[in-house]
């Protein structure tokens, strides 16, 4: 005998309209009701082909990775690490580009959820502000887990990202232990939280060591040209730091290349440290020391968090989880003094 929605309603005590919404995977339904209805449908041998997303979830998790994709090694390395993590977790990851996310992401995500192909989403859009995330809460249903990989103060969505404060702190500590006392920094865009965290960690370590001085700062923008400009600004300022922390690898590469063109030796005249440990650091001459961010580790933590939301937990808001970072030392830093 053909199983109908009426049979499931009789089995569970829920209304036919509630059962229809659960089987269609639309609307906001409690996790308890959703699970009871799906279990009843399975017991009664209701055709799984009529349950939205059922077959997909049984085989693998379909994850949408939503980002405002930009040219360059950073995004390529980020996606490569996330894809390797998805493979390890037996999930399927799709890279989806949303241009101008602050204007378009609400409709983009609403349409994506309505298509019923993806089970959950990862958002990596560093341009989004708190008000943008608050707007997203209005379009994300409870049954559709979403995690952000972009840092903001006082997270709105569940957020998993790297510990930028620790990265900045470790950078200053490496300089100190290597014998450098007069140091400088090329910052990232002040509007981006990760830039501020890296700077604050660096500055706090220096402030806690009276014999160490931050003698030069430059406001960069994470782009190659700001690395070039920062070198010329440093030379014009005559501040003469012994070591410089550049808050991403692209600026660090530009700084080192410009130094070499101007007959300034790295590391003999000045030590350099970047951030993210992209492939360019290994391929440069000299090779560049960098704060390593493990994108595969980030991906594993993010996908496991998404999996843990099924079937009972739904979305968790405002939780920030930080992935540890470390430093990879290469030719751009040398030991200036013997350390006891």
Question: How would you label these PLM feature ranges?
Answer:
Residues 232-340:
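Flexible loop/turn connectors
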Residues 64, 117-126, 184-186, 218, ...:
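Periplasmic-binding protein-like
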Residues 67-77, 95-105, 160-170, 186-207, ...:
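Hinge/beta->alpha junction and helix N-cap segments in small-molecule ligand-binding domains
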Residues 1-58:
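N-terminal helix-turn-helix DNA-binding module of bacterial transcription factors
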Residues 58-173, 236, 340:
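Alpha-helical recognition/docking segments in bacterial nutrient-uptake
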Residues 182, 213-215, 266-272:
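Short acidic capping loops at alpha-helix termini that bridge into adjacent secondary structure
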Residues 44, 115-118, 178, 234-240, ...:
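Glycine-rich phosphate-binding loop signature in dinucleotide/nucleotide-binding domains
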């Amino acid at each position: 005998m053909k199983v109908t929605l009426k049979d499931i309603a009789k089995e569970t005590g829920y209304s036919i309209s509630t059962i229809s919404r659960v089987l269609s995977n639309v609307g906001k339904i409690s996790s308890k009701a959703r699970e009871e209805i799906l279990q009843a449908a399975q017991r009664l041998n209701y055709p799984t082909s009529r349950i939205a997303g059922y077959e997909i979830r049984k085989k693998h998790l379909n994850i949408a990775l939503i980002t405002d994709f930009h040219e360059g090694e950073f995004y390529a390395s980020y996606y490569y690490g996330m894809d390797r993590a998805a493979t390890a977790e037996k999930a399927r990851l799709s890279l989806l580009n949303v241009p101008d996310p602050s204007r378009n992401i609400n409709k983009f995500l609403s349409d994506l959820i309505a298509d019923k192909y993806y089970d959950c989403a990862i958002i990596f859009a560093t341009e989004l502000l708190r008000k943008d995330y608050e707007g997203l809460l209005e379009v994300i249903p409870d049954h559709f887990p979403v995690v952000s990989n972009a840092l903001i103060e006082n997270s709105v969505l569940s957020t998993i990202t790297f510990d930028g404060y620790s990265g900045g702190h470790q950078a200053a500590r490496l300089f100190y232990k290597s014998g450098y006392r007069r140091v400088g920094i090329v910052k990232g865009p002040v509007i981006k939280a990760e830039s501020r965290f890296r700077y604050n960690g660096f500055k706090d370590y220096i402030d806690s060591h009276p014999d160490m001085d931050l003698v030069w700062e430059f406001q960069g923008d994470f782009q190659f040209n700001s690395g070039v400009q920062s070198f010329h600004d440093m030379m014009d300022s005559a501040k003469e730091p012994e070591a410089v922390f550049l808050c991403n690898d692209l600026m660090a590469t530009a700084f080192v290349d410009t130094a070499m063109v101007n007959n300034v030796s790295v590391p003999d005249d000045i030590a350099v440290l970047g951030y993210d440990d992209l492939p360019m650091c290994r391929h440069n001459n000299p090779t560049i020391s960098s704060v390593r961010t493990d994108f595969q580790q980030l991906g594993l933590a993010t996908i496991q968090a998404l999996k843990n939301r099924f079937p009972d937990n739904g979305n968790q808001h405002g939780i920030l989880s930080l992935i540890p970072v470390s430093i990879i030392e290469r030719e751009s830093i040398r030991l200036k003094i013997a350390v006891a």
